[in-house]
């Protein structure tokens, strides 16, 4: 028997998620599909795909058709769940309680000003977009057999306007 790691969802622990999340995660678990497999089937990045499941990204009409096919969910039902605009930012309590999400928060808390200083030196006065943005997660194993998470953020640089 293979050991497959699958992200699942206990909706009772996430009352702020949209109703689509429970439907999508239930189908994902039933089909035993990883986000990587679903992303490949719909032609999206795996983090972007997971964001759709958590109601943090908008699914296109094409995404909805492909998700209905890969997950075995009626297309019209899925369309009714996913056709609105995401209500971003409500899914996580603050500060986060989940240890991994808290560590991501902690990285920004500890290194945020350092990131800001280095970016300002490289690009000038501005911000990194979280809208014109992409991210990847890779697994890297070192020579000692230790696994490392490699998280890449790629955001368009937006200089502040002078007015």
UniProtKB/Swiss-Prot annotation:
Keywords: Lyase. It is an enzyme of class 4 (lyase). SMART domains: Cyanate_lyase. One of its GO terms (molecular function) is DNA binding. The active site is at residues 103, 106, 129. HAMAP family: Cyanate_hydrat (MF_00535). Catalyzes the reaction of cyanate with bicarbonate to produce ammonia and carbon dioxide. Belongs to the cyanase family. This is Cyanate hydratase.
């Amino acid at each position: 028997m293979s050991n497959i790691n699958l992200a699942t969802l206990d909706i009772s622990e996430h009352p702020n998620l949209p109703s689509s999340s429970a439907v999508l995660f239930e189908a994902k678990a039933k089909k035993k599909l990883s986000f990587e497999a679903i992303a490949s089937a719909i032609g999206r990045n795996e983090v972007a795909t997971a964001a759709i499941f958590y109601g943090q990204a908008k699914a296109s009409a094409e995404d909805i058709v492909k998700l209905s096919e890969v997950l075995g969910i009626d297309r019209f039902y899925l369309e009714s769940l996913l056709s609105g605009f995401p209500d971003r930012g409500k899914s996580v309590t603050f500060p986060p309680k989940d240890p991994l999400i808290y560590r991501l928060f902690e990285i920004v808390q500890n290194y945020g000003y350092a990131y800001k200083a280095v970016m300002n030196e490289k690009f000038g006065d501005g911000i990194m977009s979280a809208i014109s943005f992409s991210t990847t997660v890779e697994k890297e194993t070192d020579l000692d057999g230790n696994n490392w998470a490699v998280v890449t953020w790629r955001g368009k640089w937006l200089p502040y306007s002078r007015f």
